[in-house]
Amino acid sequence: MISIGTDLVHISAFAEQLAQPGSSFMEVFSAGERRKANERQGSRYAEHLAGRWAAKESFIKAWSQAIYGQPPVIAEEAVVWRDIEVRADAWGRVAIELAPELAAVVRESIGEFSSSLSISHDGDYAVATCVLTIQ
C-alpha cells in the first residue's frame, strides 16, 4: 500500500510567525535542522525552514491517510515535531528520519514502511510531498 501526504506553506506568513516576539515555533525543528537553516542568509533562512515544516506536515498527513477510518494514533497537540527530522544527503536529496520512539509508534500502527520525500520552492511558497510505502 502507498499513502501520500502533501503540505503547502506560504513563506512570508511563516517568516512572520518565526519572527514573533516570544515565539517558540523554532522548537519544532531539531538541532540539526536549525544548524542547516543558520547556514542560509536573509529570506533563504525562512524559505529553508518553511520547506522543512511542509515536509513534517506532509509526513503526518501521509501517516494519517495510511490509517484512514481509524482514530489518530497521536493527538495533533501531542506530536513532538522535532522527532520528525528532515535530513539532506551530500547532494541535497532529502529524507525523513524519525526519532526511535516515534518510529516504533508509526510501525505499530501501519507496520513496516519506507518513506520518500520531495520539497520544492516557488516564489513565496514551499511545498512538500511524502510517500509512505507500507510493506
Swiss-Prot record:
Major site of localization recorded for this protein: cytoplasm
Subcellular location: Cytoplasm
Keywords of this entry: Cytoplasm, Fatty acid biosynthesis, Fatty acid metabolism, Lipid biosynthesis, Lipid metabolism, Magnesium, Metal-binding, Transferase
Top EC class, one word: transferase
Gene3D superfamilies per the UniProt record, alphabetical: 4'-phosphopantetheinyl transferase domain
Residues that coordinate or bind Mg(2+): 7, 57
Reaction catalysed by this enzyme: apo-[ACP] + CoA = holo-[ACP] + adenosine 3',5'-bisphosphate + H(+)
GO molecular function: holo-[acyl-carrier-protein] synthase activity; magnesium ion binding
InterPro entries the record matches: 4-PPantetheinyl_Trfase_dom (IPR008278), 4-PPantetheinyl_Trfase_dom_sf (IPR037143), ACPS (IPR002582), Ppantetheine-prot_Trfase_dom (IPR004568)
SUPFAM superfamilies: 4'-phosphopantetheinyl transferase
GO biological process: fatty acid biosynthetic process
Keyword DNA-binding appears in the UniProt entry: no
GO cellular component terms, A-Z: cytoplasm
E.C. number(s) listed in UniProt: 2.7.8.7
UniProt cross-references to Pfam families, sorted A to Z: ACPS
Keyword Flavoprotein attached: no
Family: Belongs to the P-Pant transferase superfamily. AcpS family.
HAMAP family recorded: AcpS
Function: Transfers the 4'-phosphopantetheine moiety from coenzyme A to a Ser of acyl-carrier-protein.
Protein name (Swiss-Prot/TrEMBL): Holo-[acyl-carrier-protein] synthase
Native source organism of the sequence: Corynebacterium glutamicum (strain R)
Source species taxonomy: Bacteria, Bacillati, Actinomycetota, Actinomycetes, Mycobacteriales
Gene this protein is translated from: acpS
